[in-house]
Every structure is written in C-alpha cells, then in structure tokens.
C-alpha cells in the first residue's frame, strides 16, 4: 500500500550503508597504520578496507539515484540539501588546496639557510614552466567551457548535444592527466628533494587527483544523460559535477603561477 505524505521532505528508509562505510573507514585506518609499521596483515586489511569503502560508495549512490530518478523522492525542497552540502564541500576543498599553495609560497618567499637561502633550493633542477606546464593550463579551462555547453544543452532539452559536450569534457580531462603523467615522468626532482619537492608534488598531485575525481564524476553524468536520467528540471548531480569541474579548472591557474612560474623563473 502506498502511503501519502503532506510534506515535501524525503524520509529515507533504514540503510546498512552508513555502518558499512564506517567499518570500511576503520579497517582502512587500522590497516594503513599496520602497513606503515610493517605489521603482518596490514596490507591485507588496508586493501579490504578500501574495497569495502568503494563498494559502499557504489551501492549507496545507486540507492540515491533510484530514490531520485525512479521513485521521485527528490522534490525541489529536497534538492536544496545536496546543493548546499556540495557548495560547502567545494569550499572545504578550496581551503585544503589553498593551504598547499600557501606552503609553497611561504617557502619561496622566505627560504631558509638549510636550502641555501634561495628558491628553488640550491642543487634542485626544476621544470620549465613554458613547456608542458604552460601547455597543460588551457586544457582544464577549455574543458570547463565544454561542461558549460553541456549544462546549456540540458536546460534546452537537447540530450545528444549534452552527451557530446560531456564526451568532450572527459576527453580533455584525460589529455590533461596524460600530460601531467608525462610531466612527473620527466621531472628532474622527486618528492623527497627538500621542501621544493614536497610542496611541488603535493600541490600539483592533489590538484591532479581532483581532476581524476572530476573526470569520473563527468563520466557518470554522461552515462546518466545517455540513459535519459537528467532533465532540465532534475539534474542536481550534473550541477554538482559542473561546479566541481569549474573549481578544478580555475584552481589550475594558482599552481601554474605560484609553483611552476614562480619556482621556475
């Protein structure tokens, strides 16, 4: 029997996924500590914890898609929650990446005597910012234009154009990741080469990791758009992906200026 309700909120059914995700996080944390201290079984527990977390993410998000797309539980009021929550998530990511860029800027503006009092540190070879770093900077900005194209196509009800635009977005993202992989392969320094190597690989590496997450996000949105899940009235998932992607492509300007250019001149 279908029960009616007099409010626009979604009262979720009991779910096992919060506790399963918590157990996966616990196993990952304990396994990671055991692995770093060379305890027997640490690698196995770490792997099982990561697998458990990935499985929980998949089935939990699957249930959310069913509730929103097939069951119609996500009213306009309900959609405000994910929107506000994702905006706060992006703000937290901005603070995280800003801390990494700030660490690099601080070390370059006030180099200590241990690294020769100069930046880059004495004896450290750096990448030429006019080569792969410069070539790789317009790519995420171009992919941001492609995801905006996809957004306008969804609002106009043009499903095929939205799919094409998302394919373009993902393709540019893969090119960016490939170039960054080449950059790391050709890098004359490593993460253990003084404060320069630590800040360089942490900041650029985490930005690259965010690009990979955004790529997966866009792939899922492309598949959902192809299957007809997204409409001009209901596309919160795509909006979150678009916001995230614009965050990623704009942030690219900061490591290029503060790390590649400032550290390579």
From Swiss-Prot:
Coiled-coil residue windows: none
Subcellular location: Mitochondrion inner membrane
Enzyme class: translocase
Cellular component aspect of the GO annotation: mitochondrial inner membrane
Pfam families to which the protein is assigned, alphabetical: COX3
Membrane topology category: Multi-pass membrane protein
Keyword set, alphabetical order: Membrane, Mitochondrion, Mitochondrion inner membrane, Translocase, Transmembrane, Transmembrane helix
EC number: 7.1.1.9
Catalysed conversion reaction: 4 Fe(II)-[cytochrome c] + O2 + 8 H(+)(in) = 4 Fe(III)-[cytochrome c] + 2 H2O + 4 H(+)(out)
GO process terms (BP): aerobic electron transport chain
Transmembrane regions listed in the UniProt entry: 16-36, 41-61, 81-101, 162-182, 200-220, 245-265
Oligomer and partners: Component of the cytochrome c oxidase (complex IV, CIV), a multisubunit enzyme composed of a catalytic core of 3 subunits and several supernumerary subunits. The complex exists as a monomer or a dimer and forms supercomplexes (SCs) in the inner mitochondrial membrane with ubiquinol-cytochrome c oxidoreductase (cytochrome b-c1 complex, complex III, CIII).
Purpose of the protein: Component of the cytochrome c oxidase, the last enzyme in the mitochondrial electron transport chain which drives oxidative phosphorylation. The respiratory chain contains 3 multisubunit complexes succinate dehydrogenase (complex II, CII), ubiquinol-cytochrome c oxidoreductase (cytochrome b-c1 complex, complex III, CIII) and cytochrome c oxidase (complex IV, CIV), that cooperate to transfer electrons derived from NADH and succinate to molecular oxygen, creating an electrochemical gradient over the inner membrane that drives transmembrane transport and the ATP synthase.
Entry similarity comment: Belongs to the cytochrome c oxidase subunit 3 family.
Name of the protein in its database record: Cytochrome c oxidase subunit 3
Organism: Helianthus annuus
Gene: COX3
